[in-house]
Amino acid sequence: MDKLLERFLNYVSLDTQSKAGVRQVPSTEGQWKLLHLLKEQLEEMGLINVTLSEKGTLMATLPANVPGDIPAIGFISHVDTSPDCSGKNVNPQIVENYRGGDIALGIGDEVLSPVMFPVLHQLLGQTLITTDGKTLLGADDKAGIAEIMTALAVLQQKNIPHGDIRVAFTPDEEVGKGAKHFDVDAFDARWAYTVDGGGVGELEFENFNAASVNIKIVGNNVHPGTAKGVMVNALSLAARIHAEVPADESPEMTEGYEGFYHLASMKGTVERADMHYIIRDFDRKQFEARKRKMMEIAKKVGKGLHPDCYIELVIEDSYYNMREKVVEHPHILDIAQQAMRDCDIEPELKPIRGGTDGAQLSFMGLPCPNLFTGGYNYHGKHEFVTLEGMEKAVQVIVRIAELTAQRK
C-alpha cells in the first residue's frame, strides 16, 4: 500500500484532460503519455499480453497462479479527466488527520467546506487529498488506476490465489468515446468491474439512459427599425423552446432515480442559434418519452415560420442503462458485495447519475458494474479523495480476485 499514494500523485501530475468534438481517439496527446507510462509499469511488473491499441486502449494480463477452470475477470479505469475543468499543473494538497471545518484550497479564497459538502463530517481523522483550488484533482479516474495497479502488486507480492486477471485502461471516457473502440474479444474476460465510482461502499450497476439533442435554429435578421413582420429572431425562438422544457426536471432539481433535461449550451445571434441539451432517465420508456417531448417542443415553436426560417433537431442516443445486462449475471454483484463485507465495508447499491465505460461494455457482451474509488466532487476544483478510501478499494479488488478463484 505504501506506493498507492505515490502512484496516484504521479498519475495526476500528467494533464490528460479529454476534448469533446474531436474525431481522433484519444482526443488529446496527454492521454498517450499516461498510457505509455502505464504500459511501461505493467511490463516492469511482469504482466503478460501487454498491448496498446492505435485507439489508446491499454490491456494486460496477470496470469493465474492456481490451476483449474477459474473465470477470467477484468478491472478497468479511464486515463482522461473531464473537459469541464482544467487538469493542467495539478497541485495536490495532502491533509492528514482531517479534524473538521473548512480546508483552504491553495492561497486564494477557495475552500472545501462541510457546509457545502456534508460528507466531510464522515471523514474525520482521515487523510484527504485535495486540489489547490485552481484545477480538478483527477481522482476521476486516476484514483481507480492507482488502485488497480496497487492491487496487482499486492496479488503478486502476497501470492494471493487468483485466476487470470485482465486489466484495461481506456481513453476519452469523459467524452463518451472510450468504450467504442474496446475489443471485448481481445480482453477475453467473463465479466469485469470499472473502478470509477465515488465514496467507499458504492457499487453501481444502474446508470442513465442518455441522449444528446442538438437544435439548430435559423432566423432572419433585418434592421430592428424596419423589422415588423420580417425579422425572425433565432434567439427568441431558442428562449421559447427552453421555456417549454419542464423547469422542475433539470439536473439541479432532481436526484436519485429522477431523470432530467439539461440545457448544456446555447449560443447565437438573431440570424442563427444553436442549443445543446442532454437527456437522462433510468427508465427506458420515460427516456423515449423525453425524446418525443423535445421533438414536440421543436415542432410547436417552429410552427408557422417562413420557409427560409426553420428549427432542425437531431437526437443521438449516447448509452443505455446497463441494469438489464448486469442482472442477468447476479453472481457478479454477489461477489463484489461479499468482497466489501469481507473488508468491513457495507455495500451501498446506488444508481449512477451519469455513465461509465461499463455501461457501453455491458451492451457489448462484457457485464461490467462499477466499484468505488474513494473520491468525491468530481469534475471540479472541490474534488478530493481519501487515502483510506483508496486503500479500501485496493482491498476490495484483491478480495474480488480471491473470491473468484474459489468459484471453480
From Swiss-Prot:
Pfam families according to UniProt: M20_dimer, Peptidase_M20
Domain of life: Bacteria
Any one GO CC term of the record: cytosol
Residues given in the record as Zn(2+) 1 binding sites: H78, D140, D196
GO molecular function term, any single one: zinc ion binding
Cofactor note: Binds 2 Zn(2+) ions per subunit.
EC number(s) per entry: 3.4.11.4
Enzymatic reactions: Release of the N-terminal residue from a tripeptide
UniProt keyword list: Aminopeptidase, Cytoplasm, Hydrolase, Metal-binding, Metalloprotease, Protease, Zinc
Transmembrane parts of this sequence: none
GO biological process terms, semicolon-separated: peptide catabolic process; proteolysis
The protein's required cofactors: Zn(2+)
Active-site residues, as the UniProt record annotates them: D80, E173 (proton acceptor)
Positions of Zn(2+) 2 binding: D140, E174, H379
Subcellular location: Cytoplasm
Membership in a protein family: Belongs to the peptidase M20B family.
Protein's job: Cleaves the N-terminal amino acid of tripeptides.
NCBIfam families: peptidase-T (TIGR01882), PRK05469.1 (NF003976), PRK13381.1 (NF009920)
PANTHER family per UniProt: PEPTIDASE T (PTHR42994:SF1)
Protein name per Swiss-Prot or TrEMBL: Peptidase T
The species this protein was found in: Escherichia coli O1:K1 / APEC
Gene transcribed to yield this protein: pepT
